[in-house]
Amino acid sequence: MKIIRNLEFQGKQTAVCIGKFDGIHRGHRLLIEQAKKENKPIVMISFSVDEAKVLYTPYEKEKLAEYLGIDCLLEIPLTKEFCSQTPEEFAKKLLCDTCDAASVIVGSDFRFGAGRSGDTNTLQQLGEKLGFSVTVLSKLELGGEVVSSTRIRSLIGTGKMEQANELLGTPYFLTGVVRKGNQLGRTMETPTANIYPDAHKVLPPYGVYAVFVDVEGKRYRGICNLGVKPTIPGENEVGFEVWLFNFSG
């Protein structure tokens, strides 16, 4: 999968799905599934937005997009120049000149162009003019509510992981840096790994969780404690202390 973080990309007759894609949840995946039906290279356009908290970090989003069969992830920085474009400039420069879009798939609430002046009707009119088809998909509802990143953040933040996973479509996951700890667990013959997630990552409440951990292509079951280490002086950084079953290394 190609990962592009600027407009220096040249597609060729692509199927383009556009969205924020924080979490790439089940609603987002409807766009991806529709794009696959076009039998063309799939470009997923996402926008780099400074969020206080995100479901998935840029690296995690890349790994999930690749897993879902995306051919190119195009991350567009929302610069002042980019945001000042008219809807037609957006369609011409990004969808036509950069992606060479044959088809574009968006959600029903899609807005684009300066001041969010363009909507799905605008996009369909521009598609007719510029030569690409447009498919607009309704919002996915589960449990009587729209599936959204905001809803999933709330579920994770309150520890309702099974419900969050149902909306995500795959189990919530995280990546992080493994650091050498105080090795207190090793003295009790229960060595653990200390994993520190990105500071912007949405995390569940502090507590003990059952986990799966992938290590060098192999998956292990384990348990982890999420939180700080109040009994150890100077340890106040939030992290995961993970113990894996049947692991040595």
Language-model features and meaning:
Residues 1-8, 74:
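Short acidic-hydrophobic, aromatic-tinged amphipathic segments that line or gate anion-handling sites
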Residues 7-63:
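N-terminal catalytic cores of NTP/NDP-binding nucleotidyl/phosphoryl-transfer enzymes
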Residues 13, 181-249:
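Phosphate/ribose-recognition catalytic cores of enzymes acting on nucleotide-derived substrates
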Residues 15-18, 44-47, 74-77, 103-108, ...:
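Short beta-strands and strand-loop turn motifs
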Residues 25, 65, 104, 164, ...:
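Residue-level signal for inorganic ion chemistry
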Residues 52-53, 82-84:
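Acidic-and-aromatic substrate-binding clefts and catalytic sites of carbohydrate-active enzymes
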Residues 61-77:
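A glycine-rich helix N-cap at a beta->alpha junction
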Residues 84-191, 206:
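Classical nucleotidyltransferase
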